[in-house]
Amino acid sequence: MVMLDTLANALATIQNAEMRAKSEALIWPASKLIINVLRVMQREGYIGEFEYIDDGRWGKIKVQLLGRINKTGVIKPRFPVKLRDLERMPHWLRKYLPAYNIGILILSTPHGVLSHKEAIAKKTGGVLLAYVY
């Protein structure tokens, strides 16, 4: 099986496990980007603890689920967003989140992978990666 987008595969695995009311999900292959996205989701309270399992090949990540994710996915194409756009929430950005104060957008910024709330607090823009609510 060829995996073209490992981040999309990881988020789909998490969402499928949440819909089946599982307590944990196993994500493979692991990558630094996936781990950083999971850290943001953990800081925002969408997932519990996660651990990296080195299997000698690609590695796996075991994620504890809390049952708080309704929908998650990647944003394709990954386009850049300025700070001004994040603060105003234009109409094209609203299609990823159901309401103004519900959910998070995950961005790759010069300060690392952050949620859109953290990016606004640090006054930086970035490239949109994913959404979670």
From Swiss-Prot:
PANTHER family per the UniProt record, alphabetical: 40S RIBOSOMAL PROTEIN S15A
GO cellular component, one term: ribonucleoprotein complex
UniProt record, GO biological process: translation
Free-text function comment from the UniProt entry: One of the primary rRNA binding proteins, it binds directly to 16S rRNA central domain where it helps coordinate assembly of the platform of the 30S subunit.
InterPro entries tied to this protein: Ribosomal_uS8 (IPR000630), Ribosomal_uS8_CS (IPR047863), Ribosomal_uS8_sf (IPR035987)
Source organism, top-level taxon: Archaea
Gene: rps8
Protein name (record): Small ribosomal subunit protein uS8
Membrane-spanning segments: none
Homology family: Belongs to the universal ribosomal protein uS8 family.
Keyword rRNA-binding: yes
MF terms (GO), sorted A to Z: rRNA binding; structural constituent of ribosome
The keyword S-adenosyl-L-methionine belongs to this UniProt entry's keyword annotation: no
Subunit structure: Part of the 30S ribosomal subunit.
Coiled-coil positions: none
Keywords: Ribonucleoprotein, Ribosomal protein, RNA-binding, rRNA-binding
